């Protein structure tokens, strides 16, 4: 099933919410994911994202970033499990990162994607590059940093056409978030995929923690979440 409207409609028909937020979404009292972040709700059911941001279920909007095999010794012998790091996004201001474990790769991937949905964030985009000033949300409006373990990542606004000057894992996360042009600096053991991915994700989250002045919104073309209007509605 590749139509976001069909995905959302199917979830609404089959889903039995377990949380207050889930019931509000199911009953149609919350119809925009931006409202969830504005009111400070915590997403504890992946179906909430399936309904409000169904495009994240499209194959091109999901990325498996890392698969690792873990072995643990028990009284009954070795227990082998898979650990999967996955990301989801709508390529327009929303991105999530999650880790899933399972005895089979497929199960671990599904868990990771569901955790990524529940961990989805809304980011600020804009054009903060002094080389550009086009006021379009192709980059980020200001420099931000994120860290995880020994890894530190700094993202800086880039001019249109620059592309994503960052490692492959970072490119995938930024692309899913809808960021097209950035410079980056990294410190620490960046070959550790999980920590590097989390540092990039944390940097994007920190776009929400920088105070902005009203005049900066127009100057840098800042948008929060979606820049493009939704092209579908769920009945």
UniProtKB/Swiss-Prot annotation:
Domain S5 DRBM residues, every copy: 60-123
From the Swiss-Prot or TrEMBL record, what is one GO molecular function term? structural constituent of ribosome
The cofactor named in the record is: Zn(2+)
**Swiss-Prot/TrEMBL GO biological process terms:** translation
Record's InterPro entries? Ribosomal_Su5_D2-typ_SF, Ribosomal_uS5, Ribosomal_uS5_arc, Ribosomal_uS5_C, Ribosomal_uS5_euk/arc, Ribosomal_uS5_N, Ribosomal_uS5_N_CS, Ribsml_uS5_D2-typ_fold_subgr
Please report which protein family the annotation says this sequence is part of.
Answer: Belongs to the universal ribosomal protein uS5 family.
* Subunit structure comment from the entry: Part of the 30S ribosomal subunit. Contacts protein S4.
Protein's UniProt name: Small ribosomal subunit protein uS5
Q: Which organism is it from?
A: Thermococcus kodakarensis (strain ATCC BAA-918 / JCM 12380 / KOD1)
- Name of encoding gene: rps5
């Amino acid at each position: 099933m590749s139509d976001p409207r069909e995905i959302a409609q199917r979830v609404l028909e089959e889903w039995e919410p377990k949380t207050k937020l889930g019931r509000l979404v199911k009953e149609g009292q919350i119809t925009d994911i931006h409202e969830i972040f504005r009111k400070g709700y915590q997403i504890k059911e992946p179906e909430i994202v399936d309904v409000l941001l169904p495009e994240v279920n499209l194959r091109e909007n999901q990325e498996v970033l890392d698969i690792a095999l873990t072995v643990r010794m028990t009284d009954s012998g070795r227990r082998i499990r898979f650990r999967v790091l996955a990301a989801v996004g709508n390529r327009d201001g929303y991105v999530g990162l999650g880790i899933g474990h399972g005895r089979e790769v497929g199960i671990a991937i599904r868990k990771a994607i569901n955790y990524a949905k529940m961990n989805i964030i809304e980011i600020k985009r804009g054009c903060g590059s002094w080389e550009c000033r086009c006021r379009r949300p192709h980059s980020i409006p200001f420099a931000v940093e994120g860290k995880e373990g020994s890894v530190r990542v700094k993202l800086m606004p880039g001019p249109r056409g620059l592309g994503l000057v960052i490692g492959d894992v970072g490119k995938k996360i930024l692309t899913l978030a809808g960021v097209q042009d950035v410079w980056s600096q990294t410190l620490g053991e960046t070959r550790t995929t999980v920590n590097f991915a989390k540092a990039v994700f944390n940097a994007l989250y920190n776009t929400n923690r920088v105070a902005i002045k009203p005049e900066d919104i127009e100057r840098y073309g800042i948008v929060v979440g979606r820049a493009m209007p939704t092209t579908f509605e769920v009945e």
